[in-house]
């Protein structure tokens, strides 16, 4: 040690080097038994599966049944006229209520007559890919793919050509968007014995786009095949015979079923001596038939949708007007009462 006199020399001051790495602090862990604070969290709806998970369904259903009394069959008489929609097939109709779109994968029709083997006359059956096509003559049906011609006592299978594009399950006025086509069966010649014919449909479809619709929204409209003329209505009556419209589905409709038409029905009625006025009706109610007219009748009138009541309209008054069409062929009948 260097001494200068009796005093010590002081050491130079030293500085501590700064730590390049900060000191690591221990984090406090939350107790595992303590629950999180309640928070509002969004939940996802489950049960739909994958977005592309379509449903395939198949089955066999009777779509029509008709009786042709002996000797009543004539060339071109319509026996069956059915527009193919989901509601026409019971199993498919229930399943289609939870989907918006469907595509037909297979479609076949079995014509099954029940009559003696010596019954004269026959039938032609064909499938019209356009459900709005009004040309259902023998030549038009025979020109379609899969059409058949047979004697009344012979069974045949119609294997038609149909669209495979997606259609809508809920029916509307534009039937090309909701139906793959129509099956039509016509008489050929006169049947010498009574014929009971059933039409079975073998089908398979693909359902897509899940949804939910009520049965009232999926009622299929019925297309008339013959015009209604004013001279077909009796003077003083409030209705007409169902067979005048040429639609088997309307003939088979139950009593008290109420339909709305897409075209107005003008009815002339008497206001007094020499005074005639015209009313326009949009609703018709089916009335039970009798021994002379088993298919029943249709009454025109006013429909109260709120109270679900039908009021019969004014009686028809002829006044010897010239023949005119009141409802043209191709008029759509859509059921509106609560029993559909």
UniProtKB/Swiss-Prot annotation:
Keywords: Capsid protein, T=3 icosahedral capsid protein, Virion. Residues 1-39 are annotated as: Disordered. Residues 22-32 have a biased composition (Basic residues). Pfam families: Capsid-VNN (PF11729). InterPro entries: Nodavirus_capsid (IPR024292), Viral_coat (IPR029053). GO terms for cellular component: T=3 icosahedral viral capsid. The keyword ATP-binding does not apply. It comes from the Viruses. Belongs to the peptidase A6 family. Capsid protein alpha self-assembles to form an icosahedral procapsid with a T=3 symmetry, about 30 nm in diameter, and consisting of 60 capsid proteins trimers. The capsid encapsulates the two genomic RNAs. This is Capsid protein alpha. It comes from Striped jack nervous necrosis virus (SjNNV).
